[in-house]
């Protein structure tokens, strides 16, 4: 029997009779000799449009819905205005102060170059993620895939991770100063700051990776086992590729926290305005550079310019991560 594809609209009631949503199914197969089963899309008008008077009449009957409507829109407006004001303020203050001097290769008291701090930020971020990334991901794999159900250790680890996530960064800075800088003899250095930041972002990476792994359907694992794959192959060939977007989200969250961190690095990495050439060199990142310029009060304009560069850097990181996650998801779908 020949078949043809036609579009249909299925109307689903939601709430009372006046409030309905329209769900569009783009494809529908139907027998060639049964035209009555085909619904013409163009002949059906949208029925979920209501006038303001109709909405107001409903709100008068249900004042709670009206209050919720006001609160939701008010919260959205406050959020958008706050973020917009912050962005506009930073751009207005910083963009006019962007010039060739602050992009000089070496820092001096005259040009207040941010290039050494920018390069040090890249070093600090990569080194911290290189330490915390594998540990957090493999810890999450153990908790989700290998730990027994009801294991008390899993509960302890999760509670500890959630607690560490809420600890102020200054506490991590003091710990890093006492342990890595003093006890381990690493002094104020790039490696001290990276190790401290790795401990700080480890719970974020571990928890987001754990949630991403738990979101993978059990049918994927069962199908892999049914085809004869072992536990290790299933984890690395089936589960992890499916959880890549969620894992990337955790890494991006960690990256944003590393790039914007100040208090932790003042106590562990120092504030030397030079490009680090060794792991034991004292150095400063963009956030620390901006803080010190603002604190001194002599180069506030350069501090705003640094804030613009830092803002652009974070936006680019998030944009790149979204593109990578989208590409991975598209490749997986294909």
Positions of predicted regions on the chain:
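Transmembrane alpha-helical segments of polytopic membrane transport and secretion proteins
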Residues: 1-74, 322-334
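Transmembrane alpha-helices
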Residues: 231-267
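Glycine/proline-centered hinge or cleavage motifs at structural transition points of membrane proteins
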Residues: 168, 227-228, 241
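Generic hydrophobic transmembrane alpha-helix motif, especially the helices
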Residues: 162-198
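Interhelical loop and adjacent transmembrane-helix boundary motif
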Residues: 110-112, 265-311
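Periplasmic/extracellular loop-to-transmembrane helix junction in inner-membrane transport proteins
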Residues: 51-74, 88-130, 150, 292-301
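Transmembrane-helix boundary motif in ABC transporter permease subunits
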Residues: 128-161, 322-330
